[in-house]
Amino acid sequence: MAQYLRVKESHPDSLLFYRMGDFYEMFLKDAEIAASLLGITLTKRGSKDGLDVPMCGVPAHSVDGYLARLIRAGHKVAICEQIEDPQEQKQRGGKGPLKRDVVRILTPGTVIEDELLPARAHNYLVALGRAESQIAIAWADMSTGDFLVQEIADEGLETMVARLDPAELIYPHDYDLPDW
């Protein structure tokens, strides 16, 4: 659990899919969110600070379908893989868990795999920036490589964003985005 918590600390805004053999497991709040959205069993593994640790998991061989559902629900997912095998672990002395690290982060706007994308629809990643009284808007479909940039007035932003229907919208933290 210590290794999981270290990895999770580096990716607090992502659901962490943590590889354990033939499964990806999720723990704590990530497990509660994933179990609810995916309709899978929420169980427990051990305890932390005297409380049960919520846990759920999905088979590695069928992970794409689960990832697609979480991405469509708007979640960011960090994939943590075993980066050494048991033989390598033995060569380094066999102490501690297998080495693991995040090898990929999936967000709704950066998915490129056909099996994770909605069929026959654009998957736009949209970014906003301000230049005096104008707004710069850039959009890219990562699966096709299409990329466009346009400058618009404030009053055109809502219409433009609605037309693009982005999978993900990125904007500066100090940007005052309207409540549409």
Task: Show which residues each predicted segment covers.
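Basic, polar low-complexity surface loops/patches
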Residues: 1-180
